[in-house]
Amino acid sequence: MTTLLQISDAHFGTEQPPVVQALLQLARDQAPDLVVMSGDITQRARRSQFKAARAFIDRLKPAALLTIPGNHDIPLFNLALRAFAPYSNYSRAFGKNLEPLFESANLLVIGVNTTRPYKHVDGELSPQQIERVADRLRRAAPSQLRI
């Protein structure tokens, strides 16, 4: 059986140590095959917050990791960074792929980035993203759970 651990809205920068410890213990107990960090990894997309998030992931030691940014993972107040390099701090911690894919014999997880640097709320999907996901789902193996 495949085990997936999804963590959403961690908001590093406002994290509570007891919650972090509980998550680490849960991960140790469950030994997930995949950890998904699904947006709002940080509170304000600051470099220090991404460093803390990366340190947390390093402590988890996941077998596999899939991350996608949330609206809190692009700068809100640093307008220059938001306009010209909105994902730079995210990419430094988690790589440049904003829409990663995880695939195994019985699992397909498609990461979809709904953030837009020009707006800080109400994520959206483009027609190209919808088509890309639909196409990939059509090509999934019958044995794969699709997420």
What are these regions (language model features)?
Residues 6-8, 35-40, 64-71, 113, ...:
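Active-site neighborhood of phospho(di)ester-bond hydrolases with catalytic His/Asp-centered motifs
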Residues 2, 107, 145-147:
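Alpha/beta-hydrolase fold active-site loops
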Residues 51-143:
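Extended active-site neighborhood of metal-dependent phosphoesterases/phosphodiesterases
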